[in-house]
Amino acid sequence: MTPKKCLVLLCTYNGEQYLRCQLDSVLSQTGVETHIRCADDRSTDGTVAILEEYRERYPDRFAYTVNEQNKRFTYNFLDLFFSTADTDYDYYAFCDQDDYWLPEKVSAAMAKIEAAEPHPNGVFYCSNLTVADEDLRPKGLQEDPWMLRRTTTATVKCENIATGCTVVMDAAFHRHALRHYPQGILLHDFWLFLIAVFTARAIYDKNAYILYRQHGTNQIGTNKKKFSFAGLRKFSRMKSKYPALMRELVAGYGDLIPAEDLRDIETIRDYRQKFGCRMKLLFCRRFRRRSAKLTLILKVEILTGKF
């Protein structure tokens, strides 16, 4: 039987230190034939040389381009995603440049997608992940079971649980997500997750099939609940991202979103301009996150215009 094919979309920027480990783990997936398409965001280290090395080693499974100008994280991924409109793979996945995929990562996602209730607009999969140190020693799961049980359609309007490097989608959702190119957003993974939750099928796997390497400035995960002054500084620099996401969601998919959800999405879209919308976000119980602490942070973000 011919194995199914998955196109893995990888974005790189100055990632030479861990890139070979990441590429080898993707190309060694079991139960599926993985192909990689990479967009490099004008790296200044040895990243491009490594990409060329893999292109020569895997000419039928690996391709890359170097951007003419720096696009930054979100739009490097989005432009790479939209460049695949003319491709014909069974599945599509996103990939970071510094993690390690367990051999069954993609095949486990495929099995979950195939077991899910079908939807005409396709199925979007994301999963838990194992946070690891720079030497890939596990530190713990990013999402604990208690928090996952509290995830609802209401909470996902205010909190993203889809980490891009865990995302796998079927061909139907890939086509559906190409319907609208979003302008001025942050977080490509949250964008696709919102499309799936409100207009297609979204599934979350509590199991983890990826070692999510923590190093340098990308420290998250098991320490994210601890107070720090660095966290306060990060909050002060934080940009509001939800209104733009909801604006583009309405523009591209508003005709497919259930009426009550659409009203809530429009409230989030307009809260910075309309006092009534801000008050609704502050006092309506539908606008919450998965714990009292996270909901309090949400209300502070709304009050300060950071949401």
Language model segments and positions:
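Nucleotide-sugar donor-binding/catalytic module of glycosyltransferases
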Residues: 1-225
